[in-house]
Amino acid sequence: MKPRAIVSEMDSYVPGKSQDEIASEFNLNKDDIIKLGSNENPFGPSAKAIEAIGKECKNINRYPESVLNELQQELANYSGVKQSQVIIGGDGADEIIDVLAKTFIDEGDEFIVPLPSYMYYEYLLQQYGARPVYAKWNLEENKLDTDSILNSINNKTKMIFLCTPNNPTGTLIDEKDIRDIASGNPDVLIVVDEAYFEYAEVTNKDLINEFDNIFIIRTMSKVMGLAGMRMGYGLACSEIIEYMHRIKPVFSLTRLSYVAALNTLRDKNYIETSIEKGIESREYLYNELSKIDSLNVFPSKSNFMLIGIKDTGFTASEFAFELMKKGVIVRDCTSFKGLDEYWIRISICTLEEDKKFIDIVKEVLS
């Protein structure tokens, strides 16, 4: 059997390395490995979510809820929007992007992504026959090149992806830039990825009440600590949400994911503490790594940061390999379009792990 032509031409998406892989490859104890490659929450999930999951396990022989009104309302309350402006995805934010593509993308459409940015947009939309058009992220000034995006728009443009804070640079996009792009292009869907917005303490959610062509992606994998439960959500005008619900899989959110999400959202103290600890770790890492002359550390408003390592004498692959041998996983950014072979990305960890990581970096560079 031959797959569709587009599938034959695609490369597989390669996520960051797991602790199991590194433990096996380098004969290390899995529990001693510091994982900084996947932008996860290192502080664990909400205790209330864990308790709720335990209670719900007895019901997993039954299909999950098909109507998610209670969770939709909790997400609406958390986000400060109407319930009709919320859609929930059961495979993290990736399902939200996938349903967006199924709803709005026709074969031959184009979508714009500034580089570097999250690579999964391209991976998903190409499956539906859309063609990526690359705009620029100004790395020297570490900001979005808005003119590059505006100049790339044509009558085939269907979507523009704006990640804020941007992955992997950690930089916020000015609300004015989003407004300028959206207001001049009412027939183009502006997809604003806010997966990490809590760490920046900035959101563009009010724009969905002003613009019918703005869609905001969010996730519960980061601050909420539910990466393993796979739950994302989106915010937009009610019309867009209604269209998406027509084709969204009915039972994509598992029973365990549902109760985990619901109880995490109700655990306000957990959310506040998770944000505070994440920001504390980020600032500690930035301050300590910035003291190392050979590293070019980008300031970040997320739970990760981009680091240029050209002056170390290592390529990203070489540096990542040396760190892995000592039990540290970072993201080698060589595969990120828009970056060369001298960039890595690290995510936050506990303060104990932060200090251990700094010592290992100094050891590798000495």
Swiss-Prot record:
Q: Which InterPro entries match?
A: Aminotransferase_I/II_large (IPR004839), HisP_aminotrans (IPR005861), HistidinolP_aminotransfase (IPR050106), PyrdxlP-dep_Trfase (IPR015424), PyrdxlP-dep_Trfase_major (IPR015421), PyrdxlP-dep_Trfase_small (IPR015422)
Name the Enzyme Commission number(s) assigned to this protein: 2.6.1.9
Cofactor(s) in the UniProt record: pyridoxal 5'-phosphate
Checking Gene3D superfamilies in the record gives:
Aspartate Aminotransferase, domain 1, Type I PLP-dependent aspartate aminotransferase-like (Major domain)
* UniProt protein name: Histidinol-phosphate aminotransferase
EC main group = transferase
Q: Which organism is it from?
A: Methanobrevibacter smithii (strain ATCC 35061 / DSM 861 / OCM 144 / PS)
Name the Gene Ontology biological process terms. Answer: L-histidine biosynthetic process
Database matches in NCBIfam families: hisC (TIGR01141)
Name the protein family. Answer: Belongs to the class-II pyridoxal-phosphate-dependent aminotransferase family. Histidinol-phosphate aminotransferase subfamily.
The record's annotation in SUPFAM superfamilies points to: PLP-dependent transferases
* Positions of modified residues (N6-(pyridoxal phosphate)lysine): K222
